[in-house]
Amino acid sequence: MSQVTEQSVRFQTALASIKLIQASAVLDLTEDDFDFLTSNKVWIATDRSRARRCVEACVYGTLDFVGYPRFPAPVEFIAAVIAYYVHPVNIQTACLIMEGAEFTENIINGVERPVKAAELFAFTLRVRAGNTDVLTDAEENVRQKLRAEGVM
């Protein structure tokens, strides 16, 4: 697969991931954790476990909610979650915390090549750059869904 086509497929996978995120909004987060995840307060070293737990709650929310075991999420989905929920001031930290995931095509083909934080960060930036209309007001949209479901 050519480099351009591969990047296009990855981006389209990330777009599909954002649509899944918007449709489900099943998060295993308290209001405090959601505020922590989306706030402009810079995460420090002691926040690492909470930050990972919050990002993972967005990635695996539906599975956790119904009690199914987790399976590794692809980079495209993790990048979409980070782009959608994490405040820009903490995106680099979120990518560092979540490094080690695999791109979808590697999972499908059985190739092990975990991404480093820098690659996840670059891909997350690409997702944000291509989805400004989707990401605009995303936080408020999610808050409204959570309120409607009685979570907040």
From Swiss-Prot:
InterPro entries: Scaffold_D (IPR004196), Scaffold_D_sf (IPR036632). One of its GO terms (cellular component) is host cell cytoplasm. SUPFAM superfamilies: Scaffolding protein gpD of bacteriophage procapsid. It comes from the Viruses. One of its GO terms (biological process) is viral procapsid maturation. Keywords: Host cytoplasm, Viral capsid assembly, Viral release from host cell. The keyword Nucleotidyltransferase does not apply. Pfam families: gpD. It is found in: Host cytoplasm. Component of the procapsid particle composed of 60 copies of the internally located B, 240 copies of the external scaffolding protein D, 60 copies of each of the viral structural proteins F and G, and 12 copies of protein H. Belongs to the microvirus D protein family. Assembles the procapsid by joining twelve 12S pre-assembly complex into a T=1 icosahedral particle, called 108S procapsid. Ten proteins D bind each 12S complex, which are formed by three pentamers of F, G, B protein and a H protein. The scaffolding protein is released from the provirion after genome packaging to form the mature virion. This is External scaffolding protein D. It comes from Enterobacteria phage phiX174 (Isolate Sanger). The gene is D.
